[in-house]
């Protein structure tokens, strides 16, 4: 299925390649580079690129393109999901997935890729199994391997591979037994000039960090599970139990894993947590324009909005901007015409604002459209959809674990039209 994998940085350099069948020439990536040049942003590169003899399927994460080369038609989402699993595995192994880290651990990277695919077909993709096959790198292990000439490859067949629970290894023991769950929701929205919502949806995930002794069996129930739509589960979840009772029942993998991802698309369930007041005017023949925006909280259940960043691509006719922020710092690049305002935390008693004048090109016509304002923010201890965990129960083991639930909402593609 997958013949080769190329890792390409944002500068267009191939810094790692892996071949499972025959060696595919690097020249096949020329088609990818052509598509990259045509795309305005890295995220806009087509995920599937047909060539005369191959198909190129790619994902872009952590400023790296992971490009798979296949020769026969396969379901694209199957390959793309595998590429995401590769990235998640690297992140689990090395803490971060970046070009320097991959280069520093290139031997382990090749060993992991060799185990994840067998003759081009996915084989071992569970992190628990891979860590028994290929030991994660540590400073001590690296020093020992350098001196002895040994590798990170395990000397025993992983027990989970032969188990009815292949995602969990046997014989797990912890002094402190704990299970943490993070409910993270990302809101994508387009707000029109009047402040009305054009479109809004929520992409949510529940990430888990489970460190429990033995073979625990967990059940996780929600206060309002019916609002979840288009749910994707980790293989450990018993789907029939979810279908009948809307309860998550599972034997968890050991360590960090994504329990489920979900989608909330019903407009009445998506609360917009921020609003933007704006006044942007360009004069027909004058050399000055006015710019003023204010950001405030809305439907946040009393939670603080923090990490707020406002960006806007200004028209080409704007030469410079003389602005004064009530808080935070701002920059304007006269070359790219990009305005950026790092607001920070929003105080409801004193709303942050940015106001001033714009220097316009003399004689330039008035722009056809006002700029779009893009927001980034996060809200701790709030799931904007209203999702709440009711309780977490454990069966099969006699000890009492420590349990914790954390919520967070953050902005995805959040745009305000002016």
Curated annotation (Swiss-Prot):
Q: Which GO terms describe its biological process?
A: anterograde axonal transport; anterograde synaptic vesicle transport; endocytosis; intracellular protein transport; intracellular transport; neurotransmitter secretion; synaptic vesicle endocytosis
Q: Name one GO cellular component term.
A: cytoplasmic vesicle
Q: Which InterPro entries does the record associate with it?
A: Adaptor_comp_med_subunit, AP2_Mu_C_sf, AP_mu_sigma_su, Clathrin_mu, Clathrin_mu_CS, Longin-like_dom_sf, MHD
- Cross-referenced PROSITE patterns, in alphabetical order? CLAT_ADAPTOR_M_1, CLAT_ADAPTOR_M_2, MHD
Its localization reads: Golgi apparatus; Cytoplasmic vesicle membrane
**Any Pfam family hit:** Clat_adaptor_s
Q: Which terms are listed as keywords in the entry?
A: Cytoplasmic vesicle, Golgi apparatus, Membrane, Protein transport, Transport
Q: Topology relative to the membrane, per the entry?
A: Peripheral membrane protein
CDD domains the record matches: AP3_Mu_N
Question: What positions does the domain MHD occupy?
Answer: 176-417
Does the keyword Membrane belong to this entry?
yes
Q: What does the subunit comment say?
A: Adaptor protein complex 3 (AP-3) is a heterotetramer composed of two large adaptins (delta-type subunit AP3D1 and beta-type subunit AP3B1 or AP3B2), a medium adaptin (mu-type subunit AP3M1 or AP3M2) and a small adaptin (sigma-type subunit APS1 or AP3S2). AP-3 associates with the BLOC-1 complex.
Q: What is this protein called?
A: AP-3 complex subunit mu-2
Question: What organism, scientifically named, is this protein from?
Answer: Rattus norvegicus
């Amino acid at each position: 299925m997958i013949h080769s994998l190329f890792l390409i940085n944002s500068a267009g350099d191939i810094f790692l390649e892996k071949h499972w069948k025959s060696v595919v020439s690097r020249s096949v990536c020329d088609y990818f580079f052509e598509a990259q040049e045509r795309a305005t942003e890295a995220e806009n590169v087509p995920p599937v690129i047909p060539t005369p003899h191959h198909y190129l399927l790619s994902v872009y994460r952590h400023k790296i393109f992971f490009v798979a080369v296949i020769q026969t038609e396969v379901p694209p989402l199957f390959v793309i999901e595998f590429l995401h699993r590769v990235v998640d595995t690297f992140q689990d192994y090395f803490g971060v997935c970046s070009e320097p880290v991959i280069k520093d651990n290139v031997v382990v990277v090749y060993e992991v890729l060799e185990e994840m695919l067998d003759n081009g077909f996915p084989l071992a993709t569970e992190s628990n199994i891979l860590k028994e096959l290929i030991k994660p790198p540590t400073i001590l292990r690296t020093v020992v391997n350098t001196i002895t000439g040994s590798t990170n490859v395990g000397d025993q067949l992983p027990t989970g591979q032969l188990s009815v629970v292949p995602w969990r290894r046997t014989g797990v023991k912890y002094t402190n037994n704990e299970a943490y769950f993070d409910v993270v929701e990302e809101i994508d929205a387009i707000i029109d000039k009047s402040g009305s919502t054009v479109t809004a949806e929520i992409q949510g995930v529940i990430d888990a960090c489970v460190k429990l002794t033995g073979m625990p069996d967990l059940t996780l129930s929600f206060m309002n599970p019916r609002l979840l739509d288009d749910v994707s589960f980790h293989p450990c979840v018993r789907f029939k139990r979810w279908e009948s009772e809307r309860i998550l029942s599972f034997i968890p993998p050991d360590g960090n894993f994504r329990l489920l991802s979900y989608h909330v698309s019903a407009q009445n369930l998506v609360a917009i947590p921020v609003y933007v007041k704006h006044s942007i005017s360009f004069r027909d023949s004058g050399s000055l324009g006015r710019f003023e925006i204010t950001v405030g909280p809305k439907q946040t259940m009393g939670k603080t909005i923090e990490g707020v960043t406002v960006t806007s691509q200004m028209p080409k006719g704007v030469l410079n901007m003389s602005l004064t922020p009530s808080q935070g710092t701002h920059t304007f690049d006269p070359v790219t015409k990009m305005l950026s305002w790092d607001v920070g935390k929003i105080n409801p008693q004193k709303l942050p604002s940015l106001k001033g004048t714009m220097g316009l090109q003399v004689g330039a016509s008035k722009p056809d459209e006002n700029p779009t304002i893009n927001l980034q923010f996060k809200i701790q201890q709030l799931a904007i959809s209203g999702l709440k965990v009711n309780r977490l129960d454990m069966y099969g083991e006699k000890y009492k674990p420590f349990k914790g639930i954390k919520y967070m909402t953050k902005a995805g593609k959040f745009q305000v039209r002016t």
